[in-house]
Amino acid sequence: MDGLLRRYVNHPAAWCHKIGDMSFENGALLEPLSVALAAMERSGVKLGDPVLICGAGPIGLIALLCCRAAGAEPIVITDIDEGRLKFAKELVPSVRTHHVRSVSAEESAEAIVGLAEVRPAIALECTGVESSVATAVWCVKFGGKVFVIGVGKDEMSMPFMRLSTQEIDLQFQYRYCNTWPRAIRLVKSGVIDLSKLVTHRFDLEDAVKAFETAADPKTGAIKVQIKSEE
């Protein structure tokens, strides 16, 4: 198949899911929601679990919505961008935010644990950045889990003995399956509200501007959508 920036696409019906009266805008966000749903299922986040989310990008923010819907408490989310942390706070007012600074992973972890007032049972790592993964390892409790959703370098260093002596599970996600029907139900029922994540919208004819906006951190874009009125 060539590109999907087109008004009409032929696709096998067997691989399509009906979204009913859901907006196409929300429908387009079912894919990142599927990423988060797979992570929720495989990481085992439960009601009352203290959770750390590393990274307040689109996946981290949707993971935040899922953790709140699942009853995780407290939830701490981290990022290097204060604007994204402010956005996370607007999305889920009860979330605790940590601005990542140029300090060691251990120092970051100490600040995060102090903010949460408890060691997280699970860390959902949504950046793939080596220092962020290491921070998550230093944060979680004995027997906790660091679940890496983000994609990082081919090779990176980890605090191996921290993982070993604290019996921390390090788990990864690269693909997902069978999530679409669940994602559709959650959005249609209002359990998960994705509407605030689209911060910029462009017509199909302005697709180049859309990509430029998405690539420029100064725009504060979370999700940029290209739409067609036809």
Predicted regions and their residues:
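Glycine-rich phosphate/adenylate-binding loop and adjacent beta-alpha elements
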Residues: 1-16
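Glycine- and other small-residue-rich loops at beta-strand/loop junctions that grip anionic moieties
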Residues: 8, 28, 56, 77, ...
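Structural detector of well-ordered beta-strand residues that form the stable sheet scaffold
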Residues: 17, 52, 76, 145-147, ...
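Mid-domain Rossmann-like dinucleotide-binding core that forms the NAD(H)/NADP(H) cofactor-binding site
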Residues: 21-103
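Glycine-rich cofactor phosphate-binding loops and adjacent beta1-alpha1 units
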Residues: 43, 68-70, 85-169, 208, ...
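Residues in the short beta-alpha loop(s) of Rossmann-like NAD(P)-binding domains
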Residues: 80-81, 152, 176
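C-terminal hydrophobic helical "lid"/dimerization subdomain
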Residues: 111, 134-138, 177, 181-230
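Rossmann-fold dehydrogenase core element
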Residues: 145-147, 158-197
